[in-house]
Structure formats: structure tokens, C-alpha cells
Amino acid sequence: VITLGGDGTLLRAARILNYREIPILGLSYGHLGFLTAASPEERDILQVVSDALSGELHVSRRATIAADIVSVREDGTKDVVRSFALNDMALTRGPLSDMVEFDITVSGHHIDRLRGDGVVVSTATGSTGYALSAGGPIVSPDYTGMVCVPIAPHTIQARAFLTSPSDVVEIFMSDDRPSVPAIAIDGQFITCDGTVESVAVRRGPGDVLLLDYGPESFYNSVSRVFYGVRHDR
């Protein structure tokens, strides 16, 4: 599959493919092309496509995450929505909330009760997106755990942290401070049939395959996008 656009276009393609392991070649014609293999300014696009068809490009296997969102209907029954992401799951304060309060646990171990604008749980791929803007680290794409980053927490003690690939991150909304959070998966807001009670995030069942020119492409992209360094190809 070939995408023409930015990272958002590539994320939509992964979603349309339902995160099946079909190689995706991203060609950057958008605002940000961090996940794409090349742009017209860097390489001859026809040559890039030719390299892909001849099997000369590197296949980068990217871990995904699965989020189970539990909501409670007005009649007390519960609804569960499962969604997958290549980048991240973001739980944020909704338009009618001044902040959200929640408990966060990792594989049953309580980490903290936080108040603030929310939390981002991302893959290594998503570490250069919303998670980075919230203060998280840039993580090599071959890392298969998750990155958890509080968003504008009302404490200086809250810190971003990494999990192992087998961990499950659970977020429980506080009963002491009821709020209506917004939940976005790869930037797409999820509609729930009730009030959100909890979200459980774990590694997804499959990976997304991105085509690029090798592992060094990631670090070249980091220096180009975030530090403004140009690389001669």
C-alpha cells in the first residue's frame, strides 16, 4: 500500500487495513512526514516506488496497542469498545471538564492518582507525536513496550514512564471527582455509549509494517524533524 500525504494519511491507511501486516510505503506530501519513507525533496519518488517493488527497502515492524474502553450506561449496564492504534491512546478532559482525576495502574500495580488534563499511552512509534509534546521521551521504533505520559499534571512529581511489552496499563476514572473525559485513538475521537469508567491498554495482537531505507532512517528523521538537520542521501 502506498500513501501520499503526511503521517495522518499513513495512520488512516493503517486503520483502513485494520492493522494487518501489509507493508505500507509512505511518501511525504504533507505537513509532517516522520513515519514516511521519503519526500520529493529528498529522493526521486519513482525510484522509491521502484525500490519498494523490487524488495530493496527495509521492513520496519511497528508494535500497536489495543485499548478496551469501558463505559456505564444510564441503566447501569456496561459497554466495552475495543480500538487499536499505531500511535497512541489519549484520555483528556472533555469540553465540559476543567480537569480529570484518575488512578493509573500497570499490571495490577497502583502507580498514582493523578489530576490534570489527562494521559497519553503510546507505542514507540507514537512517542514522537502527542506523547512527545506532553513531555515524553523519543523511543526507538523497535521498542515494543508502551510509553505513559501524564498531560499537564497538577503535581511536579508525576513523570512519564515506560512499560514492558507484556504489561497492561489501566486507567480508572475517580468517583471523587466525576468528569466526562474525551478519548482519542490515533487522533480520532471515540464515541462511547455511556460515561467512561476505565480504559485498559495493552500491546496489540498484530504489528504494522512500514517500508523505509533502514534503521538509520529513524535517527535521520529525528535530527531532521526535531533539530532541523538536513541529510544528504
Feature locations, PLM:
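ATP/nucleoside-binding phosphotransfer catalytic cores, i.e., glycine-rich phosphate-binding loops
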Residues: 72, 83, 91, 107-110, ...
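Catalytic core of DAGKc-family lipid kinases
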Residues: 31-117
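Short glycine/serine/threonine-rich phosphate/pyrophosphate-binding segments
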Residues: 8-14, 128-133
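Short aromatic-centered micro-motifs
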Residues: 104, 126, 183
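A generic structural signal for short beta-strands and their flanking turns/coil linkers
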Residues: 61-65, 85-87, 98-102, 117-119, ...
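Gly/Ser/Thr-rich active-site loops/lids in small-molecule metabolic enzymes
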Residues: 109-157
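Gly/Ser-rich helix-loop-strand patches that form or flank binding pockets
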Residues: 12-30, 34
